[in-house]
Amino acid sequence: KLSAAAEVKEGKFGAGSYIVRMDQPYSRMADMLLDTQYYNVNDPRPYDDTGWTLGPLRNVKTIRVKDEKILAASMSIINGPAKVTGKVEGVGNAGFVVNHTGESAVTQLRYRLKDVKFSAAEAAFKVGERSFNAGSFIVKTEGNPSDLSARLAKEATDLGLTATAVDKLPDVAQHAVGTPRIALVHTWVNTQNEGWYRIELDRLGIPYDYISDQDVGKMANLREKYDVIIWGPVGGNAQSILRGIAKFSDSEAAIPWKGSALT
């Protein structure tokens, strides 16, 4: 991580910029994950996942630097995951605004502050010279816990978000945003894709119920219990999804899909 700004042929990079040095044994890994991938049209078609250029995937500006001067720049090694530190900026007691950037951290913030009242802007707006996207959170001081400022600052800092304090709430159409009750559906038709959802929901700390497709058929009113139902991508057609995996014999018991005496 750059300790001070550095300027090379490819441009000027500010303090805090991340440098992946190529004078290390794992430089080939950086090539594979960060540089543009070129495929020869005469080669066999790639099999399975090939979207490995992480910069565009994560909307992070990533530049390959050929100027060796960058290796002499003042920098410090990062021991552990690189993490962006968020902040609270601005002055005001009316409330806070958090831009909707499409990051998962925005959703995490809502769930971490479940008892706080949030609203979402229905159109883009500005606070001073700064622009905010439609969907940005507006958190009023009035009607919220007295420790709102400290709690919001703590979570925004940890999640890498910027919360802007305002002395006047944005004049924009908005609606209340709660914490949706989520169900993730298990089906034996395809377990891999639902597993990716489970991994990410668990990593983000977003609560959900893990239910079987058989449960879905037995519930009289799903809307009464859940606001969002996630069904991972599966192959086949509507009929094969509805029927699921057939038994080998009539005597075969249901296949366990959670921890049990059999599994």
Predicted regions and their residues:
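Intrinsic-disorder/low-complexity accessory segments
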Residues: 1-263
